Amino acid sequence: MYLNFYGLKEKPFNATPDPKFLCLTPGHREALAQLVYSVQENRGFLVLTGEVGTGKTTLLQAFRQRLNGKAVVAYVLDSTLPFEGLLEYMLEELRVPTPASSPAQRLLALRRFMLDRRRAGQTTVLVVDEAQNLDTAALEKIRMLSNFETPTEKLLQILLVGQPELRVKLNRPELRQLQQRIELRCSLPPLSREQVCDYILTRLRIAGAHDLGLFSEQAQTRIAVHSRGIPRRVNILCDHCLVIGYADQRRRIEVDVVDQAIEALEGPAGSRARRFTSPVRATWQRWFVGAVSAAGLTGMYLLALARHVRDLFIR
């Protein structure tokens, strides 16, 4: 929608992680280097934590690339599964034929696979995302997987990835045996104001922007403060700024555009509850969305009309 207007080749602030837009801060680079080194050294149990939106998924994509064929990785996304489901998920990711008879046979099949990979010069890595959702029983059984080893080294490297609640869970007394096996704990901090500004400029550059001053310094500072340094929030806010700037034919994003984007995302201060609890207003909002869709309105006119109706609703 706004690409041609701002001279961009692609959207710079997509919410979906894209390795092409990888922007590693010093904190991200340090965490990535520690993770890769720990896997290469067969450390065993690793933990990575960070708030929602701090770039854990993006970092894991880079982690997988940096291993560069030296490891086979099973990436488990559904941490709500019981251990048997996690094991089946892992075997499927690794393309290990899964005997249907018993969990013991599945474990033996996994061990044979890992030994074969070790003979081929590769290590096996299990990554469990959103690991704060794992219950104590599943965590304890995952710990037991780390018992797979040769006389000289671990066959399986385990990386638990999650939100800060994971750190709290791992400190429970009943998980003390698991605690003792953790060789590395690293976390992703929010971005500083300067890092947010660098992040915005880097993504604009990768997207093909000729004008890297598209966001004024004041606008970047406002985005940094409001996003609290969380990359996902930066992306969402910047994308809304470009949409609103395009609708208003603004070649430069200033603070007032950022404030409009914040209002569009969160509502005016003090009025959010009132807007969302009014059944009449909600009915008109639903009618408006349906009418616009039926009319097939797009682009700048749709945005301008939507913002006008929004302003009517919040008065």
Where are these regions (language model features)?
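A short, basic N-terminal segment
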Residues: 1-41, 300-315
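Conserved P-loop NTPase "ATPase switch" module shared by AAA+ and STAND
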Residues: 20, 114-138, 142
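Conserved NTP-binding/hydrolysis module of P-loop NTPases
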Residues: 10-11, 70-72, 81-100
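Helix-loop-helix "sensor" segment of P-loop NTPases
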Residues: 96-97, 116-121, 125, 150, ...
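Walker A/P-loop nucleotide-binding motif
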Residues: 41-62, 79
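C-terminal alpha-helical "lid" subdomain
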Residues: 210, 216-315
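Conserved alpha-helical scaffold flanking the Walker A/P-loop in AAA+ ATPase domains
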Residues: 34-38, 104-123
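Structural recognition of the conserved hydrophobic beta-strand(s) that form the central parallel beta-sheet
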Residues: 49, 125-129, 157-163
